[in-house]
Amino acid sequence: MSKIIGIDLGTTNSCVAVMEGGEPKVIPNPEGNRTTPSVVAFKNEERQVGEVAKRQAITNPNTIMSVKRHMGTDYKVEIEGKEYTPQEISAIILQNLKASAEAYLGETVTKAVITVPAYFNDAERQATKDAGRIAGLEVERIINEPTAAALAYGLEKQDEEQKILVYDLGGGTFDVSILELADGTFEVISTAGDNRLGGDDFDQVIIDHLVAEFKKENNIDLSQDKMALQRLKDAAEKAKKDLSGVTQTQISLPFISAGAAXPLHLELTLTRAKFEELSANLVERTLEPTRRALKDAGLSASELDRVILVGGSTRIPAVQEAIKRETGKEPYKGVNPDEVVALGAAVQGGVLTGDVEGVLLLDVTPLSLGIETMGGVFTKLIERNTTIPTSKSQVFSTAADNQPAVDIHVLQGERPMSADNKTLGRFQLTDIPPAPRGIPQIEVTFDIDANGIVNVRAKDLGTSKEQAITIQSSSGLSDEEVDRMVKEAEANADADQKRKEEVELRNEADQLVFQTDKVVKDLEGKVDAAEVAKATEAKEALQAAIEKNELEEIRAKKDALQEIVQQLTVKLYEQAQAAAGQAEGAQGAQDAGAKKDNVVDAEFEEVKEDK
């Protein structure tokens, strides 16, 4: 069976891993890095992904960052006259990770397990699946990020019964989950979080501080200067990382702006204490969901066996200290927080292919599901934190006499009134026979599969007439749209490859022009002038084709010139050999004459053995 890769599709960084020899391994990208920034940029009709896109994020307006925040919405971004959905942008990142995996494994990859925040609703999960399909991947399973972390951690802990808190503070989202591990079974008991909180926010408080300090000193607002803002963002991220290891760091940005008299420089010492003061509110915001998850699980902090940290932002000392204070447990640091989710996804891939045995993953639905009933009330059929896959049915009736149809309004959320929750979809069950209010029996069934995707059906028990819906919210893509996007993604991949080949062809042609000039110069006066003229003419024809940018013409003229240059090079080589032979003969004769006139004998002493 072909390998199933595990992908952590993150808000700020993504990571891909695979099972090798029974162990999950992170696959490095072409630059040799183990994580890839989730950034896509468009420049001169070329797509850039990762570090190269991130480096010019602020200066290039056609750069898309943190697109994961928009998954499951109808958000679109227009780039160079074309509209892109969050699924398409995510697919570009997934294509990049897929290509890294294929280069590493030396085989085509078509299947993946992709992780999502535990708090992702149905629309967001469906959008993630669609992104995988557009990228040419069969998404075998969508799993929650904290669950994936527990899977990676739990490989060597399958025989221990434990209650684990997974504290996942990534670049753009925060999740906390409580899991139970026993006999190779991972069960998520509860989950909570904030999908608008992450490492980006910690960077931003440093940027705001730098902007405020510079404005105080120079009365210039750097936040209005895109070039300066890019440098501030890079410096803030570096300072944040530095302060995880040292107690103070120097931020030095020369020529950050122009003053009336001369250029202005930003020089500032940032201490860990100041950073903790600036970010105290952000750290505090992670604790409320932590308390809520514990409460939902019916546990006190003292009942936890282990606290696992996930996400690069958990390296911040204040974050580690806060979770230690809150739980009374020293956070476990035996897993790389940047990679553990991808490793867990790879383990789940191994479970699905049969490479990993004895592991059962029981995930939960993060939000309650139900329908709108009389008076706009939200009636829950499946409570949040219910283990999935699951199915639940409930019988309802009509609200008016002789009601011919019922509208089924499917919702997700925790508020008591329908208007305050998120609509997942609507459908209608018609042709209900006339009957007094309350008599018809309408059975509504909710099914949630292992990916957290919802199917709802309504059945009139009197007539057995049935109507069903697979939830496709406003952001969901139809099969036709996904197919179109898959074709576009493939076409773009082909276009990117073609563009690369074009660049290589032009480079080869330029190199040949340079080589021809050199050969012609070396052969001047040594070969027939007609041959030199022929080479010069072919070279000029190639230069003209390069200027016109006619690729087929470049290829033809390049091949023609290549042949002429090869013939000339052979002649040059033959002449060099002949010249070397003559020189050798002359040198030999000279050496022989010199031998007679000036013979130098080595001194030696003959030693005779005594007989």
Curated annotation (Swiss-Prot):
Induction: By stress conditions e.g. heat shock. The keyword ATP-binding applies. The keyword Nucleus does not apply. InterPro entries: ATPase_NBD, Chaperone_DnaK, Heat_shock_70_CS, HSP70_C_sf, HSP70_peptide-bd_sf, Hsp_70_fam. Disulfide bonds: none annotated. Residues 579-598 are annotated as: Disordered. GO terms for molecular function: ATP binding; ATP-dependent protein folding chaperone; unfolded protein binding. Signal peptide: none annotated. The modification Phosphothreonine is found at T173. Keywords: ATP-binding, Chaperone, Nucleotide-binding, Phosphoprotein, Stress response. Belongs to the heat shock protein 70 family. This is Chaperone protein DnaK. It comes from Bacillus cereus (strain ATCC 10987 / NRS 248).
